[in-house]
Swiss-Prot record:
It is found in: Cytoplasm, Cytosol. Keywords: Cytoplasm, Lyase, Magnesium, Metal-binding. A motif (DDXXD motif) lies at residues 306-310. One of its GO terms (molecular function) is sesquiterpene synthase activity. One of its GO terms (cellular component) is cytosol. Belongs to the terpene synthase family. The keyword Metal-binding applies. The keyword Lyase applies. Its main location: cytoplasm. This is Germacrene A synthase. Mg(2+) 3 binds at T453, E457.
Length: 554
């Protein structure tokens, strides 16, 4: 029997609708993939071969030229075509500098030192931050001579984000480079001024690769010594990949419209386009097309589940819903409140479809791990709902244990592994045990989200926010609590950076890149003290337009 409540009092009776910004814009997209293929495919392939020749034929003694080329390819967003060649080059170059004990760097300028440091660490090579010692004076301060080196300081600024827990010099370097760049930015000439201003707004290492590529193509076009062939290749490739993304977004948008869940659940956020943007942030390459579709559908459905627990369901209704999710059986639908029956049915249907899809390649076992994570998520959502309803303020540790689960990072990262064929059953087992890098992604998601949503949650009357729990337990101000949350995020990023240098490892490089990209999505979506997912107008809308609406002019 369905739950009957004579006089229902909703948690937020004055909830406001959360309509989509996009309407049917992407449903009505007419694919231009075939047209682009006919006109540009041959040229793209030809340019790709030219770039490959450039990459493989760089002289042995010109390390700086090789590293600059690799960095340019990565920042233009085309390096995915040359992963094998780039890794071979990076491995060879790192072995050279290690054998030479970094002596080759003694004559390098700051820009080159910092670029090499960043590139090697990005690729998992443990280059020492000691290469920056030569830029310090006898008092342990950075030399005055580099304070006017804008290009070098920008390179140092970006390199600092790859620091680990032992890199105290880079903690100081980040403060120094940030202050120096801020003081000189307005007086720089473009395109360097634009690059500095963008970097101060969004760190490269914490940015979304596809978004950063779109920005860099614009910057590179203004460079005096640009390579015209590389620029055209990047533009053509961006437009071709954009066409594929539009096709996927059209397919997903049609699926979402056919479900018609939002009309029945007006309290829920209609964010399927933003969910797809998130999936592209995790992996944008053509080979992950199916993975993006799987992840997008799950993110959009998870937002509805979150809103049901957070903004609409009563404790009695949520108790029934939690038990139904725990039992994971369509028969449970009969006991659910009427408004949520359709949603519950579609969740089970989605998982059945995912299982059938994965069964084709003998990987249906993956669904078990996602279902278990979904059950854990529902239980933790229920705990938060009880805290709010009863006005209970938990201790910070109690809050954090539960809220790391409700960050959804663990659950959604499991889903993100579905479409990656290299991920094995052993990888799912490893991840389910909450290894260090998994916890780091959860911490980043939790604390950055908590900072961004604090004021909105307080307006709703929410007392058990992470900030409030920390303030009460430690007797500090809101500002001090937020500062501590930023420190937790910084330390979690250092954990991720350290895990990226631990090769060979118990998990694959593909998994590492996905987890790092997931954390980057958090920084972009919530890192400017705004909830970009719930209120996408300011943060996500312009990025979505840049990636999925506007082509690059050739």
């Amino acid at each position: 029997m369905a739950v009957q409540i004579s006089e229902t009092v909703r948690p937020f009776a004055n909830f406001s609708p959360n309509p989509s910004l996009w309407g049917d814009q992407f449903i009505n997209h007419k694919s231009k993939t075939q047209q682009i293929s006919r006109i540009y495919l041959e040229e793209i392939e030809g340019l790709k071969n030219e770039v490959k020749c450039m990459l493989t034929s760089t002289p042995e003694g010109k390390m700086a030229d090789t590293v600059n080329l690799i960095d340019t390819l990565e920042r233009l967003g085309v390096s995915y075509h040359f992963e094998k060649e780039i890794e071979e080059k990076m491995k060879h170059l790192f072995n050279l500098i290690k054998a030479d004990n970094y002596k080759d760097h003694e004559g390098c300028d700051l820009y080159t030192d910092a670029l090499h440091f960043r590139l090697f660490r990005q690729h998992g090579y443990p280059i020492s931050s000691g290469i920056f010692n030569k830029w310090m004076d006898g008092n342990g301060k950075f030399k005055e001579s580099i304070k006017s080196d804008a290009k070098g300081l920008l390179s140092l600024y970006e390199a600092c984000c790859l620091r680990t827990h032992g890199d105290t010099l880079l903690d100081e370097a980040l403060v120094f480079a940030t202050a120096s760049l801020k003081s000189m930015a307005a007086n720089l000439a473009s395109p360097l001024r634009k690059q500095v201003e963008h970097a101060l707004f969004q760190h490269l290492h914490f940015g979304i690769p596809r978004v950063e590529a779109r920005h860099f193509i614009t910057f590179y076009e203004e460079e005096e010594h640009k390579n015209e062939m590389l620029l055209r290749f990047a533009k053509l490739d961006f437009n071709a990949l954009q066409a594929l993304h539009k096709e996927e977004l059209s397919e997903i948008s049609k699926w979402w419209k056919d479900l018609d869940l939002i009309s029945k659940l007006p309290y829920a956020r209609d964010r399927v386009v933003e969910s797809y943007f998130w999936a592209v942030g995790v992996y944008y390459q053509p080979k992950y097309s199916r993975a993006r579709i799987m992840l997008t559908k799950t993110i959009a459905m998870t937002a509805i589940l979150d809103d049901t627990y957070d903004s609409y369901g009563t404790l009695e209704e949520l108790d029934v819903l939690t038990k139904a999710i725990e039992r994971w059986d369509i028969k449970e639908i009969n006991g659910l409140p009427e408004y949520i029956k359709g949603f519950y049915k579609q969740v089970l249907k989605l998982y059945q479809q995912l299982e059938e899809e994965l069964a084709k390649e003998g990987r249906s076992y993956a669904v078990y791990y996602a279902i278990e994570a979904c059950k854990e998520l529902a239980r933790s959502y229920a705990v938060e709902a009880k805290w709010f309803k009863k006005g209970y303020l938990p201790g910070f540790e109690e809050y954090l244990i539960n809220s790391l689960v409700t960050s959804t990072a663990g659950y959604l990262n499991i889903i993100s592994f579905f479409g990656v064929e290299s991920v094995t059953k052993e990888d799912f087992e490893w991840f389910s045990k909450k290894p260090r890098i998994a916890v780091a992604t959860q911490i980043i998601t939790r604390v950055i989200d908590d900072i961004a949503t604090y004021e909105v949650e307080k307006e709703k009357g929410q007392s058990a926010t992470g900030i409030d729990c920390y303030m009460k337990e430690h007797g500090v101000s809101k500002e001090k609590a937020m500062q501590r949350f930023y420190e937790m995020s910084t330390n979690a990023w250092k954990d991720i950076n350290e895990e990226g240098l631990s090769w060979p490892s118990s998990f694959s490089r593909d998994i590492f890149v996905q987890l790092r990209n997931f954390s980057r999505m958090v920084d972009v979506t919530y890192g400017k003290n705004e909830d970009g997912y719930s209120k996408p107008e300011k943060i996500l809308k312009p990025l979505i337009i840049a990636l999925f609406v506007d082509q690059i002019k050739l």
